[in-house]
Amino acid sequence: MMEKGSVVEAAVTRSPMQMKMGDHELEGNTTSALRTAETFLRLFPVGLCVSALVLMLKSSQQNEYGSVDYSDLGAFRYLVHANGICAGYSLFSAVIAAMPCPSTIPRAWTFFLLDQVLTYIILAAGAVSTEVLYLAENGDAATTWSSACGSFGRFCHKVTASVAITFVAVFCYVLLSLVSSYKLFTKYDAPASRPTEAIEVAAFPG
């Protein structure tokens, strides 16, 4: 009975050093889990961007009405380039994020800025491609543009799939932007609140 009590007492009375080591171990496990999650989140857009890029590169059709290719339209060429850039960046940033090195403020700022820039690049690519695809599907009576997808249905189907995958990649980049924003701004302390008693109000003569 005495021995059991001493064991319980030893377990309860942990030294400050032991408690500090336990806190550091818990923090290390949390950091490792977050690093793994961020790495996978950065790797996921690689497959999406490559899929959208390949689909767009294969978007061409030739029939009795003529021929059409993705390279005929600047919006689709931009989508290909944007997806290629984003795929390369996602792979590179995933490798950097997977490295077990301390996250410094310059590194956090770099990820934050690049994530923001790449998000807007691929969002713009999806937006302009959607507009062109809408015109190809429906035409424009005001400018006497007829619908092209009635004659080139296979081309439009591939382009639609490529644009849809691009918007899934946009969603992933929005999440990455939120993650990098959180990691950056948590490195700064919140502004200290000034007590109302310390605020001096200037007295003006009546």
Curated annotation (Swiss-Prot):
Segments crossing the lipid bilayer: 37-57, 79-99, 108-128, 159-179
Signal peptide limits: none
GO terms for cellular component: plasma membrane
Family from the record: Belongs to the Casparian strip membrane proteins (CASP) family.
Keyword Nucleus: no
The protein's name: CASP-like protein 2A2
Species of origin: Glycine max
Top-level lineage group: Eukaryota
Pfam families for the chain: CASP_dom (PF04535)
Cytoplasmic side: 1-36, 100-107, 180-206
Key words of the record: Cell membrane, Membrane, Transmembrane, Transmembrane helix
Lineage of origin: Eukaryota, Viridiplantae, Streptophyta, Embryophyta, Tracheophyta
